[in-house]
């Protein structure tokens, strides 16, 4: 089984496990079970790894906004660490977070913020993708291609994807108290000539974090 197929199979298994724990109006934290899985990350709410989740205190006067921060200790892509004979390689990380609105509340907004930094010499090309999801629905993505002919000293993507209340893009129709799974996917893919030893790197910014906000509202 290929690495991509294995990751997909494990994602499905984790999602089934998370979904089985989520129930309408259940008495538990609004943002709770989570996992991070891929060639560049591996951790779970009850299994330590190279990602951890931190709660962010609620803002005064904003009772229905919930925030968490995921911190990545060593999620990075380095060309020099890959066998020169490999022409295409990359790193991926899929983060999944269960959101469980309390009784009488529904999800009305989702937001994700992160920063990706890349640098490279002439030679390799880089494809960088950051995507926010709710269940199987894509809420938005930021996609960049750094061409092989370009020398890039510093490229920074300030990713801020938002859907629902206060945003241009809507959320899918959700039921009162309906639990969902928020997803965020990183995909960094490099392509180079065989046996080409050229500098290239992709990393998260200094904070090495992903912040996810969820906004709830009274059901109407």
Regions found by a protein language model. Name each.
Residues 106-119:
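A short beta-strand element within beta-rich, extracytoplasmic domains
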Residues 116-173:
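Short helix-loop boundary/capping segments
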